[in-house]
Amino acid sequence: RVHRRQRQMCIRDSHYPEVMTKLSSKTLREFGETYIKETMIHRGKAPFFIDKMPNNFRHIGLIHMILPNAKIIDARRHPMACCFSGFKQLFAEGQEFTYGLKEIGTYYKDYVELMDHWECVFPGKVHRVQYEELVTNFEPMVQRLLDFCGLEFEQSCVEFYKSDRSVRTPSSEQVRQPIYKSGMDQWRGFDAHLGPLKEALGDVLLLSLIHI
């Protein structure tokens, strides 16, 4: 919503994200204050909350400028698992790139390249969590994440599935149960049909096999 408002205020002959350099510190601060105010309906009185919209990675520069205290978490899965999960999910709106194997592979590759850029521009500001490591080394990974966020450990951090909080994303069912491994390799059952996805991922897929 803040992003849409920012686009409406674009200075003539300027486009997002270039226009950000022409906005005053006062305007940027107002964007941040507007975001905090408009998200209160979802977080209530909670001092911290998570905005996990899937396209947030595109706006990390904007987020950093209007919410300088925000913690950026880059949650990743194996590229094939991530893309297959998106491909089989019917989203309520948007995310049109998920409806084609080539398209979602290209989008994921662009995401990886952009995240590499953000990590160079904002060193130490992005904390990456690899799902495959999380499911096998859960509590140490949770503690590492809490350390990055400057938060104390609470039992609810590892018993998140007992929460009755509102979840407005496609993962609403997953967060109601303990972390599990069964979803990691679902894509392999359809491997013979995922050629266009593998081709679109290219080197990103190869590098993931090396690092995971």
PLM regions and their residue ranges:
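Short N-terminal helix/helix-N-cap motif within the alpha/beta-hydrolase-1
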Residues: 58-61, 84, 139
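Single conserved hydrophobic/aromatic residue that forms the stacking wall/gate
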Residues: 1-7, 11, 210-211
